[in-house]
């Protein structure tokens, strides 16, 4: 079983939302996040690509290798994602030891 960190879990929560990627080459991609993997590989749909020189291109879909991603911008609404909530619904542990009178 693999242990996923917060960034990978957040990326999984962002599936179905519009995200922006900046690559190590300086290119940026903005589109709907279709799929993300534990290795940070992502698939985007309805993508607007902007090259470092400023050329803008529209693509139906694109797959980006995680090692080529410099950073990812996710929607602000994900700051309220369940993975950031404290698990306050856990019951208090029982009191142990002899009963006091």
Curated annotation (Swiss-Prot):
Subcellular localization, as worded in the UniProt entry: Cytoplasm, Cytosol; Nucleus
Primary location recorded for the protein, binned into one broad class: cytoplasm
SMART domains: Sm
RNA-binding in keyword set: yes
Keyword check for Transcription: no
GO molecular function: mRNA binding; RNA binding
GO annotations of cellular component type: catalytic step 2 spliceosome; commitment complex; cytoplasm; cytosol; nucleus; precatalytic spliceosome; Prp19 complex; SMN-Sm protein complex
Stretches assigned to the Sm domain: 6-78
Pfam families on file: LSM (PF01423)
GO BP terms in the entry: 7-methylguanosine cap hypermethylation; mRNA 5'-splice site recognition; mRNA splicing, via spliceosome; spliceosomal complex assembly; spliceosomal snRNP assembly; U2-type prespliceosome assembly
Keywords associated with the record: Cytoplasm, mRNA processing, mRNA splicing, Nucleus, Ribonucleoprotein, RNA-binding
InterPro entries listed in its UniProt record: LSm4/Sm_D1/D3 (IPR027141), LSM_dom_sf (IPR010920), Sm (IPR047575), Sm_dom_euk/arc (IPR001163), SmD3 (IPR034099)
Family classification: Belongs to the snRNP core protein family.
Described purpose of this protein according to its UniProt entry: Plays a role in pre-mRNA splicing as a core component of the spliceosomal U1, U2, U4 and U5 small nuclear ribonucleoproteins (snRNPs), the building blocks of the spliceosome. Also binds telomerase RNA and is required for its accumulation.
Subunit structure: Component of the Sm core complex, present in spliceosomal snRNP U1, U2, U4/U6 and U5. The core complex contains SMB1, SMD1, SMD2, SMD3, SME1, SMX3 and SMX2 (Sm proteins B, D1, D2, D3, E, F and G, respectively), and is probably a heptameric ring structure. SMD3 specifically interacts with SMB1.
Protein name stated in the entry: Small nuclear ribonucleoprotein Sm D3
Organism phylogeny: Eukaryota, Fungi, Dikarya, Ascomycota, Saccharomycotina
GN (gene name): SMD3
């Amino acid at each position: 079983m693999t242990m996923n960190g917060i960034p990978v879990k957040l990326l999984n929560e962002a599936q179905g939302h519009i995200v922006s990627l900046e690559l190590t080459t300086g290119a940026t991609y903005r589109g709907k996040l279709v799929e993300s993997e534990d290795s940070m590989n992502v698939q985007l749909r309805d993508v607007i690509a902007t090259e470092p020189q400023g050329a803008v291109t529209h693509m139906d879909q694109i797959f980006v290798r995680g090692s080529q991603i410099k950073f990812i911008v996710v929607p602000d609404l994900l700051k309220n994602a369940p993975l950031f909530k404290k698990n306050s619904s856990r019951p208090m542990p029982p009191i142990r030891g002899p009963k006091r009178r």
